[in-house]
């Protein structure tokens, strides 16, 4: 059976005034329907560049190697050149949750209007149906007074509520693949736990594939089935999450594990 997503031999380079810089090199990974792949690594390791490549969201100075493939739903995304092809996947087949929701919402447009616009682009429905789906999804992610929030701007919501609204927007089109880029980093511990549980519930309910990006192996342990550890633009270790956590092979993975707090020895 083919994977929902398969990335093969991906190199991503950026052309700069100082020359061509390699951001990620020889990345190969896969995600199946209903599976969560965690990608973990420090800032600058290439996690987000890899994820954005799946939607071709990297900037205009980006180049990909000719033998690379990003096979999504049996199509090679790297061969997409028209806006129409890319529109099919951006917010349709693939949705992305970003670390900072204020960067995702247009500040001068109400949240509901943005959700409705996205649904009208990707679904064969009318405006009233799109509004109903949007409000129901806001309720689904635990936002009280969803009808009221639908008519508010992003800056009027708390940080945790904005994050939930962004998750609702990402999920409203029922994507096959969800890219979650550090979705809990900016939240306090209580809200972080709620958002993680919400994402887990929705994955189970809708059976979508997920790439969950973070610098925190503790979060990966809670949500992921498999994990890929990235360091300096390369995947240095990957496998089932329990196997990697119990028996890490690479020194960098061991270092990440050693940095986790020992809940059994908090007074040490």
Regions found by a protein language model. Name each.
Residues 226, 238:
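Short, glycine/charged-rich "phosphate-handling" switch motifs in NTP-dependent
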Residues 15, 69-88, 126, 197, ...:
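ABC ATPase NBD Q-loop/coupling interface
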Residues 220-222:
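A short, surface-exposed alpha-helical micro-motif characterized by mixed small hydrophobic
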Residues 172-176:
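A short, proline-enriched helix->beta-strand linker immediately N-terminal to the Walker B motif
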Residues 4, 13-26, 57-63, 81-84, ...:
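A short, flexible loop at the N-terminus of ABC-type nucleotide-binding domains that lies
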Residues 3, 144-148, 239-268:
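Short catalytic/signature loops enriched in Gly
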């Amino acid at each position: 059976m083919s994977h929902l997503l398969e990335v093969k031999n991906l190199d991503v380079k950026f052309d700069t005034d100082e020359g061509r810089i390699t951001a990620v090199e020889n990345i190969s990974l896969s995600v199946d329907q209903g599976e969560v792949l965690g990608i973990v690594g420090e800032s600058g390791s290439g996690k987000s560049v890899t994820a954005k490549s799946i939607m071709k969201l990297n900037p205009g100075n980006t180049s990909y190697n000719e033998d690379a493939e990003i096979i999504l739903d049996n199509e090679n995304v790297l061969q997409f050149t028209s806006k129409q092809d890319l529109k099919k996947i951006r917010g349709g087949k693939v949705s992305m949750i970003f670390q900072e929701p204020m960067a995702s919402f247009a500040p001068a447009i109400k949240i509901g209007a943005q959700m409705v616009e996205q649904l009208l682009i990707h679904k064969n429905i009318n405006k009233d149906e799109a509004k109903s789906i949007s409000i129901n999804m806001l309720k689904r992610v635990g936002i009280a007074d969803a009808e009221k929030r639908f008519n508010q701007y992003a800056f009027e919501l708390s940080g945790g509520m904005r994050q939930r609204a962004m998750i609702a927007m990402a999920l409203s089109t029922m994507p096959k693949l969800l890219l979650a880029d550090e979705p809990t980093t900016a939240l306090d511990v209580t809200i972080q736990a709620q958002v993680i549980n919400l994402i887990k519930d929705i994955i189970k309910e809708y059976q979508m594939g997920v790439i969950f990006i973070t610098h925190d192996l503790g979060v990966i342990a809670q949500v992921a089935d498999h994990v890929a550890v990235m360091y300096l633009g390369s995947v240095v270790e990957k496998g089932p999450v329990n196997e990697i956590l119990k028996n890490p092979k690479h020194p960098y993975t061991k270092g990440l594990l050693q940095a986790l707090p020992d809940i059994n020895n908090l007074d040490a």
